[in-house]
Amino acid sequence: MKKEKAVVVFSGGQDSTTCLFWAIEQFAEVEAVTFNYNQRHKLEIDCAAEIAKELGIKHTVLDMSLLNQLAPNALTRTDMEITHEEGELPSTFVDGRNLLFLSFAAVLAKQVGARHIVTGVCETDFSGYPDCRDVFVKSLNVTLNLSMDYPFVIHTPLMWINKAETWKLSDELGAFEFVREKTLTCYNGIIGDGCGECPACQLRKAGLDTYLQEREGANN
């Protein structure tokens, strides 16, 4: 894959930044695409742009604000509380988000001569999101290939690993401190270790604590 080109679906968060570093290792040329869907914190887009600039990656931002019009949710509406009731999808779930993001990423990839698409979706920590499942990604991969008559390959480096293992991967890629200090995972828009209170921060911290304990144990 070293001679080929890839497009990374990129939010500036822990997972997609780890995937960006993974793609840089795997491919000769990498571009990143970020989607503006009127998310609560535009800082997410700024963060993604800053990371791409620092890494020398061509970065495209696409307007997907129609998602907020079609599917109001807690990620785009400040008047909606972030909740997750047992047996229900979290209020942060956006209907069709990954379907649309991957579809538009594929259109961009074909235009720039890339057949590889990289996304940070993960079934291990997927929080009940149906569009993070491996079966969905594989199904969409086939659909995209048929719809554009183009040999896309969607890569999901994080699909079967948990948050602690994602931290481990970033460390193996030489990007641990970069990911920890410069990415934005927090629903409240705080870069780095975040607010520590929202579900995204709690999941990130739990994984970080577990990995640091494992790393310390391995070094002793």
From Swiss-Prot:
Record-level GO BP terms: queuosine biosynthetic process
Recorded metabolic or biological pathway in which this protein acts: Purine metabolism; 7-cyano-7-deazaguanine biosynthesis
Cofactor note: Binds 1 zinc ion per subunit.
EC number: 6.3.4.20
GO molecular function, one term: ligase activity, forming carbon-nitrogen bonds
Binding site for Zn(2+): C186, C195, C198, C201
Listed transmembrane segments: none
Entry-linked HAMAP family: QueC
Record text on subunit structure and interactions: Homodimer.
Protein name as annotated: 7-cyano-7-deazaguanine synthase
Lineage: Bacteria, Bacillati, Bacillota, Bacilli, Bacillales
